[in-house]
């Protein structure tokens, strides 16, 4: 099997019977200390899609005539991910305020739809932050972000979410609207500062 990394031939020891996953691990070890990670795999000229990756990695490497690995700089990947997360968070602010307006207009069904979108965005952004920190080998609790105490901010976020849950459970839409409009602005601004800090690296 011919192995390439970023279009350059790669001399690598692949014992008979090695799986594509084992070969990928060897290539990943070669990249240690370079600030790069594998971001795509092509087998016989075909890029392996994400939904086929697990199955393909389990197959013997010898089934393919050529295996090409593409790598990218970690810094660039994290920067792009954090910038996109920041855009999503701005959208969540818009949805949050719109949901509050709808609650005040007694349009609770539509408001709940928008609130659900907010929760999905927050969850997505949270996962993005965790993965970005992992790629950069950063301890989030030790991150030095100007004007942001990360530990206190996480506690504040948890408190606000508990308050929203409580308002939802008792059906207090007036309280829920006030929480969405006024009590998440500080949390949101600190989210954005953290995302900007991780993007700048």
Put a short name on every predicted segment:
Residues 2-201:
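C-terminal-biased regions
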């Amino acid at each position: 099997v011919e192995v390439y990394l970023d279009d350059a031939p790669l001399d690598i020891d692949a014992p008979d019977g090695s799986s594509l996953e084992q070969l990928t691990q060897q290539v990943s070890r070669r990249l240690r200390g370079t600030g790069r990670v594998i971001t795509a795999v092509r087998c016989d000229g075909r890029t392996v899609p994400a939904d086929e990756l697990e199955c393909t990695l389990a197959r013997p490497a010898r089934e393919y005539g050529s295996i090409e690995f593409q790598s990218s700089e970690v810094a660039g990947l994290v920067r792009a991910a954090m910038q996109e997360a920041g855009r999503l968070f701005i959208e969540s602010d818009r949805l949050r305020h719109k949901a509050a307006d709808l609650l005040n207009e007694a349009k609770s069904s539509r408001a709940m739809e928008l609130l659900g979108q907010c929760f999905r965005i927050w969850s997505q952004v949270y996962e993005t932050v965790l993965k970005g920190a992992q790629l950069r080998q950063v301890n989030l609790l030790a991150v030095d972000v100007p004007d942001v105490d990360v530990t206190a901010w996480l506690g504040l976020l948890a408190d606000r979410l508990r308050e929203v849950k409580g308002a939802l459970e008792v059906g207090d839409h007036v309280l829920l609207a006030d929480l969405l409009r006024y009590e998440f602005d500080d949390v949101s601004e600190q989210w954005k500062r953290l995302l900007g800090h991780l993007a700048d690296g």
